[in-house]
């Protein structure tokens, strides 16, 4: 069934997601903070809106929120570069506008950083012990949205995002050394991010939480060295033996949606 969908934040994930949903027959609106991106969205037949979300409100054309069946909040926190930023208050503003516009279904893109450095196999029922500023604020955002009776929210806790132009190895290879060599990777490819969201859209959105991590967990040392060789990058220099051995499980989503991951080996060529 065709839906009227708004993608709030047409960035690295939001833009290709909006393109895919449009090709799937949905009516798609997309927001950006960049004026230069508006014409690009328009050229792709995505209805464009210039919007800027801050802790104090949302500036721009609020017509973006009109008559939406579903909104996907895909705004990256970007708290590493701006640790004083109040992403949680930004999402609070989004919540208010969604209520004002009678939006009933929300998908919120969160992160596995909400688990902090917990060890073991982590499920959606695991304790949340975020250590980073981003992780702490994302927990607040999740609680804010799922406890709003005016709409239903599905939270997607994405692992580390990778794609053709994005991979942790590009940064790891620049570091003097990288710790936790025997820890497990918990990543997900852009293709699977989009397909998981599409699977959700084809059903009624309900209050729920899903981990979204490819069920492929080699050691960091083995995986990043192999991918570096494959991509022609400098290998990361691993140091230390202290291991945070965690494995984020996506079994719940796989079970509920009979989902099969598309990029099974995280770009590793067998």
Regions found by a protein language model. Give the residues of each.
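Conserved beta-loop-beta element that borders a ligand/cofactor-binding pocket
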Residues: 141-164
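Conserved N-terminal Rossmann-fold NAD(P)-binding element of oxidoreductases
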Residues: 5-9
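Substrate-positioning beta->alpha
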Residues: 157-158, 167-170, 177-201
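Conserved Rossmann-fold NAD(P)-dependent oxidoreductase catalytic core, especially the SDR/UDP-sugar
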Residues: 93-131
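N-terminal Rossmann-fold NAD(P) dinucleotide-binding loop
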Residues: 14-15
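C-terminal amphipathic/interface module of NAD(P)-dependent oxidoreductases
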Residues: 47, 51-55, 234-235, 241-270
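Mid/C-terminal beta-alpha module of Rossmann-like enzyme folds, strongest
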Residues: 196-250
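NAD(P)-cofactor binding segment of oxidoreductase domains
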Residues: 66-107
């Amino acid at each position: 069934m065709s839906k009227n969908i708004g993608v709030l934040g047409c960035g690295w994930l939001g833009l290709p997601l909006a393109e895919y949903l449009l090709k799937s027959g949905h009516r798609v609106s997309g927001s950006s903070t960049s004026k230069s991106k508006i014409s690009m969205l328009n050229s792709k037949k995505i209805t464009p809106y210039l919007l800027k979300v801050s802790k104090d409100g949302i500036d721009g054309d609020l017509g973006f929120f009109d008559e939406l069946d579903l909104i996907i909040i895909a705004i990256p926190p970007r708290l590493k570069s701006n640790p004083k930023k109040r992403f949680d208050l930004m999402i609070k503003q989004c919540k208010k506008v969604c209520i004002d516009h009678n939006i009933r279904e929300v998908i919120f893109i969160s992160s596995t950083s909400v688990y902090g450095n917990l060890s073991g196999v982590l499920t959606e029922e695991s304790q949340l012990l975020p250590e980073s500023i981003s992780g702490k604020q994302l927990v607040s955002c999740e609680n804010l949205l799922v406890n709003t009776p005016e709409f239903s929210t599905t939270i997607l806790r994405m692992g580390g995002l990778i794609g053709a132009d994005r991979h942790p190895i590009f940064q790891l290879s620049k570091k003097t050394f990288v710790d936790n060599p025997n820890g497990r990777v918990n990543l997900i490819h852009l293709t699977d991010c989009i397909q998981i969201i599409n699977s959700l859209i084809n059903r009624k959105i309900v209050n729920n939480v899903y981990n979204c991590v490819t069920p492929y967990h080699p050691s960091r040392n083995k995986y990043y060295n192999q991918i570096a060789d494959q991509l022609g990058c400098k290998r990361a220099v691993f140091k230390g033996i202290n291991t945070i051995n965690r494995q984020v499980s996506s079994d719940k989503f796989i079970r509920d949606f009979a989902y099969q991951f598309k990029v099974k080996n995280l770009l590793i060529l067998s």
